[in-house]
């Protein structure tokens, strides 16, 4: 929170929370989310909650929806079918507005106008949303013991940590890992040079 607070200025209008996180795979605890919500309240910021990985959780990690915590600030939550339901080609998602909507009437009106003028949903995919959300949750077969995503996470994490000078925290959610390179072994000056050296 100290880093977020240090980077907040009078020009800061919103905060983005990706939970589970891309690229680290972190799943934020309730206290962290409460602190973010309180910070947003103190600075009158919108909260944008990207929760596309909310069902991809490992090792009993718990996803807490930001909208359930940020009751005093406008919280715009994004989700969709592409990750947990493996339907990326459907291009089907949604957003939920929760919290204090009274102070955001103009913003909400703008979203309504934009959706009426410029956006056209994938109608067949819209019908799939109800079935996906209310039906059998096949993602569980992939994230529980013996599941492909869990096993791939465990193997990738072990392989990364077996490389001298590379360490990685085991992700609690999503489908990413964020390794750390020991600067004593890998004297990388910047990420562009690292890619060029590879």
Task: Name each model-derived stretch.
Residues 1-198:
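PLP-dependent class I/II
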């Amino acid at each position: 929170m100290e880093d977020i607070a240090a980077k907040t200025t009078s020009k800061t209008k919103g905060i983005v929370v990706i939970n589970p996180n891309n690229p680290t795979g972190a799943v934020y605890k309730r206290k962290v989310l409460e602190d973010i919500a309180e910070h947003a309240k103190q600075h009158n910021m919108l909260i944008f909650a990207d929760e596309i990985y909310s069902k991809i959780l490992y090792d009993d990690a718990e996803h807490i929806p930001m909208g359930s915590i940020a009751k005093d600030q406008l919280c715009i939550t994004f989700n969709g079918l592409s990750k947990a339901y493996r339907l990326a080609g459907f291009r089907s998602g949604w957003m939920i507005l929760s919290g204090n909507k009274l102070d955001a009437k103009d913003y909400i009106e703008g979203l309504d106008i934009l959706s009426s003028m410029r956006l056209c949903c994938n109608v067949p995919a819209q019908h799939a949303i109800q079935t996906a959300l209310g039906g059998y949750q096949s993602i569980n077969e992939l994230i529980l013991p013996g599941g492909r995503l869990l096993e791939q996470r465990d193997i990738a994490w072990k392989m990364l940590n077996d490389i001298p000078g590379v360490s990685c925290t085991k992700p609690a959610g999503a489908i990413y890992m964020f390794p750390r390179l020991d600067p004593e072994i890998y004297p990388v000056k910047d990420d562009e040079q690292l890619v060029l050296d590879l």
